[in-house]
Regions:
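Glycine-rich phosphate-binding loop and adjoining beta1-alpha1-beta2 segment
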Residues: 65-105, 110
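The beta1-alpha1 cofactor-binding region of Rossmann-like NAD(H)/NADP(H)-dependent oxidoreductases
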Residues: 108-120
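A glycine-rich helix->loop->beta "capping" turn
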Residues: 119-148
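Canonical Rossmann dinucleotide-binding motif of NAD(H)/NADP(H)-dependent dehydrogenases/reductases
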Residues: 35-73, 77
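NAD(P)H-dependent oxidoreductase Rossmann-fold/reductase module
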Residues: 2-25, 98-99, 229-396
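Catalytic loop of short-chain dehydrogenase/reductase
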Residues: 153-262, 268-291
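Rossmann-fold scaffold of SDR-type NAD(P)-dependent oxidoreductases
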Residues: 46, 131-139, 151, 218-223
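Gly/Ser/Thr-rich loops at beta-strand to alpha-helix junctions
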Residues: 47-54, 112-114, 139-143, 225-229
Length: 396
């Protein structure tokens, strides 16, 4: 079939298998161009099909020749209906990894569930014995709690008072004022249940109990802080409470891993275009201004550049891992540079529908958004008839 982008609000309903494959190849080429990383050799990635999790899988495999197991929850394609981008990404990744002689297997299912945890543990036990790195990178809006059976839904709201600021519809370029009403207490509880650290802790407990963590194993989860400009809706809102919980969980996990000298870290990453960030009011406008400035300064990074730097310059230098005063790894250091944030704040006050094409990088934002779904890649013939039914080798 001919596959074109079909939009509904902040979601693209279609994805392109050949474009997703090109995305994987581009990321692999980047990692190879940066040389070898003396990293982990057996890696579990929970949330492995898109964004930072996918880039972590690619960096481990093609930077350190690691065997990888990826867990994700994606929609397989049917005849006449494309699958989700994460499905195509994972199919392409496995294909490339196997061609390179690397071990790569995937599990498609709800990572919050006991069943998927058990399936993953069994696979590690039979194929790898133990893992020395666990990446936790889930980005789900809902979680069915495996113990209570409660379905929790996260919300993105300010706490205590309503919040008004500018936002942009990145499809039309229209800048408008938006007001977000404050959350209630239940919203906070639900958001922490979905996006906090409880499930990360459960995974690590199960892995340790089953003796599947190698001595000195490391686990890393991803977080975001951002500037004062976005803090009411992000770091000081419901999602910020979840991130606080995630960060506190790192210390609890480290305590639980003392017998194997294991360590848990949260890495604070930069703002990037993702399916999740596109749905958060205010953030797309911030990102389009940030991109413009970081590109002008020559310090812009996408997912793969961020994760390559995390692995090469922070996690695997042979030295102690550098952290901030709260024990977090900071690869948002370039985004948060005072001069860059100052320029963003200046542009923010000037941003209107009329000025944004000039002062922001809306074109870059749109391109990155379409890239998430396999569109707008050079070297892909989007007019060609494409087979939408693609299998993942280890799942088929």
């Amino acid at each position: 079939m001919i596959i074109e982008p079909r939009m509904r609000g902040f979601i693209c309903l279609t994805s392109h298998p050949k474009g997703c494959e090109q995305n994987i190849k581009n990321q692999i080429e980047y990692i190879k161009s940066k040389g070898l990383i003396d990293g982990a050799k057996k890696v579990l990635i929970i949330g492995a099909s898109t964004g930072f999790g996918l880039s972590s899988r690619i960096t481990s495999a093609f930077g350190s020749d690691a065997a990888t197991i990826g867990v994700f929850f994606e929609k397989p394609p049917l005849e006449g209906r494309p699958g989700s981008p994460g499905w195509y990404n994972s199919a392409a990744f496995e294909n490339e990894a196997h061609k390179a002689g690397l071990y790569a297997k995937s599990i498609n299912g709800d990572a919050f569930s006991n069943e998927v945890k058990k399936q993953t543990l069994d696979l590690i036990k039979s194929d790898l014995g133990q893992v020395d790195l666990v990446i936790y990178s889930l980005a789900s809006p809902v979680r069915l709690h495996p113990v209570t059976g409660v379905l929790h839904r996260s919300v993105l709201k300010p706490i205590g008072h309503s919040y008004s600021n500018k936002t942009v519809d990145f499809h039309t370029g229209i800048v408008s004022e938006i007001t977000i009403e404050p959350c209630n207490d239940e919203d906070i509880v639900n958001t922490v249940a979905v996006m906090g650290g409880e499930d990360w802790g459960m995974w690590m407990d199960e892995l340790k109990k089953a003796n599947l963590l190698a001595p000195g194993a490391t686990t890393v989860a991803y977080s975001y802080i951002g500037p004062s400009l976005t803090e009411a809706v992000y770091r000081k809102g419901t999602i910020g409470r979840a991130k606080d919980h995630l960060e506190a969980t790192a210390f609890a996990i480290t305590d639980s891993l003392t017998s194997i000298q294991g360590k848990a870290y949260v890495s604070v990453n930069k703002a990037l275009v993702t399916q999740a960030s596109s749905a958060i009011p205010v953030i797309p406008l911030y990102i389009s201004l940030l991109y413009k400035i970081m590109k002008e300064e020559g310090v812009h990074e996408g997912c793969i550049e961020q994760i390559q730097r995390l692995f090469q310059e922070k996690l695997y230098t042979g030295e102690a891992i550098p952290t901030d005063e709260k024990g977090r790894i900071r690869i948002d250091d370039l985004e948060m540079r005072a001069d860059i944030q100052e320029k963003v704040a200046q542009l923010w006050s000037q941003a209107t529908t009329e000025t944004l094409p000039e002062i922001g990088d809306l074109a870059g934002y749109k391109q990155d958004f379409l890239n998430l779904f396999g569109f707008e890649f050079e070297g892909v013939d989007y007019n060609a008839d494409t087979n939408e039914v693609v299998n993942i080798e280890s799942i088929a």
